[in-house]
């Protein structure tokens, strides 16, 4: 992972700490600010290469969607955006897009988990690669806060968790960890650590 990249919510080591040296102790928003861009939402931005990416709601009313947007890190201009629908969800509009996207250090591809439990895979240029509706396939249910888990990239896997109330071997309300192949989106495994969802 190149120094300076922050490919997922808690950084390259998943501990919330930067390896960068010489960072300022206080931000000067008047003298050293390079750019500012209106964005909104609750997602934590990630940095991969010369892109700053985050999720947020886009549109209003019947046109409300979730969006993954990547900005040019040098200028703040929109490099690309990808929108997808939020359905089968009781998440109110102001709580959409809480989770952060994650970038695969090996490919630069971006993975996002929407509030309605939709997983989307995008190329580093914002092209749609695949998607899976965990809500439809595993009866994942949403809460007032939506899905707040950011995808974890582990080797060839994209791992998400969801509270599900499914049937068959995954029956009963529980938290499940669902591992998807990062290239195809195929389900590799579903883990059920036990216990009731909170």
PLM ranges: what are they?
Residues 1-198:
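Noncatalytic, solvent-exposed loop/strand surfaces
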């Amino acid at each position: 992972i190149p120094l300076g990249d922050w490919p997922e919510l808690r950084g390259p080591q998943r501990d919330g700490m930067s390896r960068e040296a010489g960072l300022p102790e206080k931000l000067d928003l008047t003298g050293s600010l390079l750019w500012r861009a209106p964005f909104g939402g609750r997602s934590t931005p990630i940095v991969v290469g010369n892109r700053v990416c985050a999720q947020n709601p886009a549109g209003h009313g019947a046109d409300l969607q979730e969006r993954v947007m990547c900005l040019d890190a040098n200028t703040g201009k929109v490099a690309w955006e990808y929108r997808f629908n939020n359905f089968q969800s009781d998440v109110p509009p102001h709580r959409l897009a809480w989770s952060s996207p994650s970038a695969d250090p090996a490919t630069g591809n971006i993975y996002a988990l929407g509030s309605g439990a939709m997983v989307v895979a995008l190329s580093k240029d914002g092209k749609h690669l695949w998607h899976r509706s965990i809500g439809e396939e595993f009866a994942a249910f949403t809460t007032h806060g939506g899905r707040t888990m950011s995808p974890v990239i582990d080797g060839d896997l994209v791992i998400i968790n969801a509270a599900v109330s499914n049937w068959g071997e995954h029956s009963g309300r529980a938290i499940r960890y669902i591992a998807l192949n990062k290239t195809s989106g195929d389900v590799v495994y579903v883990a059920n650590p036990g216990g009731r969802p909170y």
